[in-house]
Amino acid sequence: MNADEKHVKRVKIRLHELREASDAAELDKFLARRKGIINVEVIADFFTVTVTYDDRLTTPGQIIADLSSIRFTPEGSTILND
């Protein structure tokens, strides 16, 4: 594992709701523009988003705050240790 790889983390965030496919697309596009975000996987059926991020540039708390700022209400989060 190189130095950069050890800073790559994943967090799974459960949202209050994702009403439509357009919500998932909006969420994906919004997060992709945020600093430190490497990848976003949205599972609309289960109201979850898995975010791969660089822990030197952002934190799960910041990602959750960003989601809250655009009307997606996080219900909880789980740090994934791969």
Where are these regions (language model features)?
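Conserved short beta-strand edge segments in small beta-sheet-based binding/regulatory domains
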Residues: 70-82
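Short acidic amphipathic segments
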Residues: 28-46, 73
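A generic structural motif
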Residues: 47-52
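Short amphipathic alpha-helices in soluble, non-transmembrane regions
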Residues: 26-31, 62-70
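Helix N-cap motif at beta-to-alpha junctions
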Residues: 53-58
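Short, thiol/selenol-centered motifs that function as redox-active sites or metal-ligating centers
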Residues: 13-31, 35
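Long, contiguous binding/interaction regions
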Residues: 3, 42-43, 61-65, 76-77
